[in-house]
């Protein structure tokens, strides 16, 4: 078992989204700096200084100004800043606002969201606690044979404890590879190895005005597994 059995919770680097810098990304001509949710700019960062990333890139508009994840403020947040996620559409693709632990790279107009970071657990997590606000709308743009084409455009928050040899890359942009998509609620392992546990919530209603508390209990596929020691956990 994870030991000790109970503690006050492990600290997630920059979980409050207080520290931001920039990341250089190519655009149609040249490059541009996009918001990067870590204290040290991407080109200089190492280790936990590169804990978070998003799909921010230079192709979202011709000017490269529309971003999927930005530093913001909102009533009810803890601290001075938070992250704002917003869906954006450009000539090449439509992309959801996103933020995750891992890395994001572009190869031309194709993007790869690479999920996974090294993380050391001092106890078996019971849940992930967070605050959020959301403005949910109707689906009004459909492309690439989506699983749902009508109704509300739900938000999704999930956390995973994994034992992976490598990051798992999801391919999107002008070329989508559905075989790279994954959902910890429906699979307990990927090519990179096993998913030990997960917590998940769908956001189906708008909640504005002030941030709301949310707790994601961890559901364990492996109820007695020791702390993961893989390259990405």
Each PLM stretch: what is its role?
Residues 132-148:
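Short amphipathic, basic-aromatic surface patches that mediate peripheral association
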Residues 2-129, 150-163, 167-233:
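Aromatic (Trp/Tyr/Phe) and Gly/Pro-enriched flexible surface segments
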């Amino acid at each position: 078992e994870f030991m000790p059995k109970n503690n006050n919770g492990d600290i997630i680097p920059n979980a409050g989204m207080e520290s931001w810098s920039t990341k250089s990304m190519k655009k149609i001509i040249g490059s541009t700096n996009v918001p990067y949710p870590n204290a040290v700019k991407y080109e200089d960062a190492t280790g936990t200084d590169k804990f978070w990333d998003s799909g921010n890139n230079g192709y979202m508009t011709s000017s490269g100004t529309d971003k999927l994840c930005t530093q913001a403020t909102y009533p009810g947040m803890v601290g001075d800043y938070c992250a704002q996620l917003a869906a954006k559409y450009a000539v090449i693709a439509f992309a959801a606002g996103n933020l995750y632990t891992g890395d994001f790279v572009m190869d031309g107009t194709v993007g790869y969201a690479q999920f996974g970071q090294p993380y050391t657990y001092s106890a078996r997590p019971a849940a992930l606690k967070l605050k959020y606000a959301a403005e949910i709308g109707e689906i009004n743009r459909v492309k690439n044979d989506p699983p749902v084409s009508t109704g509300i455009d739900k938000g999704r928050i999930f956390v995973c404890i994994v034992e992976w040899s490598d990051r798992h890359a999801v391919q999107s942009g002008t070329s989508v590879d559905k075989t790279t998509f994954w959902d910890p609620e429906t699979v307990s392992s990927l090519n990179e190895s096993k998913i030990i546990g997960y917590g998940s919530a769908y956001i189906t209603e708008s909640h504005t005005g002030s941030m709301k508390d949310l707790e994601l209990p961890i559901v364990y596929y492996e109820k007695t597994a020791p702390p993961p020691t893989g390259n990405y956990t």
